[in-house]
Amino acid sequence: MRVFAALLMLLVSAQDDEMKKRDAFTREFKDKAPAKRVEAVGKMHGSVEDKSIVAVARGLTDPAPEVKKATAACLETCTDSGGSAVKPLCAILTNKKEDKDLRLACAKALAKEEYKAEATDAMIQAITIDEKEKELYAFGAEVTKILGAFAGQDFGATKETPAKWQNWYKLNQAMLAKADAEKLAAWKKSAGKGK
């Protein structure tokens, strides 16, 4: 019984610490200086609460590229049990107008996600590179490695690789989406969000 009480106290303390950290982040992230916002994001590394993930993910829309990169790097260290960062990370990864390093940081963060369907689709879109976009080949090769490890598949790194991934995704999309929906429902139930 003492062990249970000690564990409960530890859990409550950790939640309280993250809430304080999140409150400080919310205040500090309003600073006009990008360096201060980067610093605020850095303090959120390792966050696990959904409210924290949602707050940090907003940094992906910051006008300063260094803040976006810091946000993606931070999200890579977080436990996003509710999948709250998936959509904003995918949006940047698939946007060819965004900086390649930022897009790669988003791919790395997505590779840590528990939710596979949307993240896999975004990575496949990111590696689908037109012949006129030769400057993206190295980026595409890096994302292909990340995608392979994330999905547990290897289709090499050739011109045919995106088509192979697209075919694989068509065959597995429903299964991935179903697994994601089940994970989300279980998370909502455990977090008291699904009634």
What kind of feature is each model-predicted range?
Residues 27-35, 60-66, 94-101, 128-138, ...:
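Short coil turns that connect the paired helices of HEAT/ARM alpha-solenoid repeats
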Residues 33-76:
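N-terminal, post-signal-peptide region of Sec/Tat-exported proteins
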Residues 45, 76, 111-112, 148:
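Structural signature of alpha-helical solenoid repeat scaffolds
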Residues 141-166:
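Leucine-rich solenoid repeat scaffolds
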Residues 158-195:
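Pro/Ala/Gly-rich low-complexity, hydrophilic intrinsically disordered segments
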